[in-house]
C-alpha cells in the first residue's frame, strides 16, 4: 500500500517505521522540514513541508498530528487530495472532523502510549478503525492486520469512551508514579523500591477486577 504520513512526531514515527516493512511510505509532510527529512530518511520517503507538494498518487493519507491540529491540517490538504482516503490517528477526535473536508474519511487509532526511545509491540496493540464509506473499511482492515492481531471496528463514540478510560489507565497512573517519585526523592529514598509494588498492581489489574484488587485507601 502507498501511504503518505502527515506529522513527524512520536505516533507518526512509530507508524512509519512499522509500516515500511510491508508498505511504501511515499511522503512525510511536516511544518518543520528538518523533522520531515529525519523521518523520511529512515523510511525511504520524500520529505516535504508544503501541502502544495503532496503527491495524490497514494492509497491512504495518515494525519498523525496533535488533536488540536487535525481540523486545520484536514482543511489545508483538501484541495490537493480530492480522491484519497484521509485518516487520523486520534482516539478523542470524531471522524466528522475529516468528513467536513474529505468524502473518504477514516480513523486509524492505535491504543498505545508512544515514546520515541521505546519500541512498540505492534502485534499486541489494539487498533481501532472507522470510515465514512463502507469500501474503505476493507482498506483499513488490510492495513491494520499488517501490524496487529487485534483489530476492531469502533464508532467515534465508542472510541472516545475508550480513550477516556485510557487516560485514567495510562496518563493518570503515570502522573501518580511521578508524584510517588517526588515524595521519595524529597527524603532521598530510592524510587526503585516501589518497582515490585507498581508491577504487581498492574498485573493484578489485568488479571482480575480492579475494584476487587483495591487493598487500601486511595486518599
Language-model features, listed with the residues they occupy:
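Internal alpha-helical scaffold of NAD(P)-dependent oxidoreductase catalytic cores
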Residues: 35, 39-42, 119-165, 169-206
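Hydrophobic anchor at the start of a short beta-strand
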Residues: 3, 25-26, 45, 84, ...
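Localized chelating/binding microdomains
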Residues: 1-3, 22, 96, 116-119, ...
Amino acid at each position: 500500500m502507498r501511504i503518505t504520513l502527515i506529522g513527524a512526531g512520536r505516533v507518526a514515527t512509530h507508524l512509519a517505521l512499522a509500516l515500511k516493512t510491508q508498505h511504501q511510505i511515499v511522503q512525510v509532510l511536516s511544518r518543520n522540514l528538518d523533522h520531515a527529512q529525519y523521518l523520511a530518511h529512515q523510511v525511504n520517503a520524500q520529505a516535504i513541508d508544503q501541502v502544495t507538494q503532496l503527491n495524490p498518487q497514494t492509497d491512504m493519507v495518515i494525519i498523525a498530528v496533535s488533536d488540536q491540529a487535525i481540523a486545520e491540517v484536514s482543511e489545508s490538504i483538501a484541495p490537493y487530495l480530492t480522491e484519497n482516503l484521509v485518516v487520523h490517528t486520534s482516539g478523542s477526535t470524531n471522524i466528522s472532523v475529516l468528513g467536513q473536508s474529505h468524502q473518504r474519511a477514516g480513523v486509524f487509532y492505535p491504543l498505545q502510549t508512544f515514546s520515541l526511545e521505546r519500541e512498540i509491540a505492534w502485534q499486541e496493540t489494539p487498533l481501532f478503525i472507522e470510515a465514512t464509506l463502507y469500501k474503505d473499511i476493507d482498506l483499513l482492515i488490510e492495513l491494520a492486520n499488517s501490524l496487529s492481531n487485534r483489530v476492531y471496528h469502533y464508532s467515534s463514540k465508542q472510541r472516545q469512551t475508550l480513550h477516556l478510560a485510557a487516560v485514567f489507565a495510562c496518563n493518570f497512573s503515570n502522573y501518580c508514579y511521578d508524584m510517588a517519585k517526588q515524595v521519595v526523592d524529597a527524603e532521598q529514598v530510592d524510587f526503585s523500591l516501589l518497582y515490585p509494588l507498581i508491577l504487581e498492581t498492574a498485573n493484578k489489574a489485568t488479571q482480575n477486577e480492579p475494584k476487587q484488587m483495591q487493598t487500601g485507601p486511595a486518599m
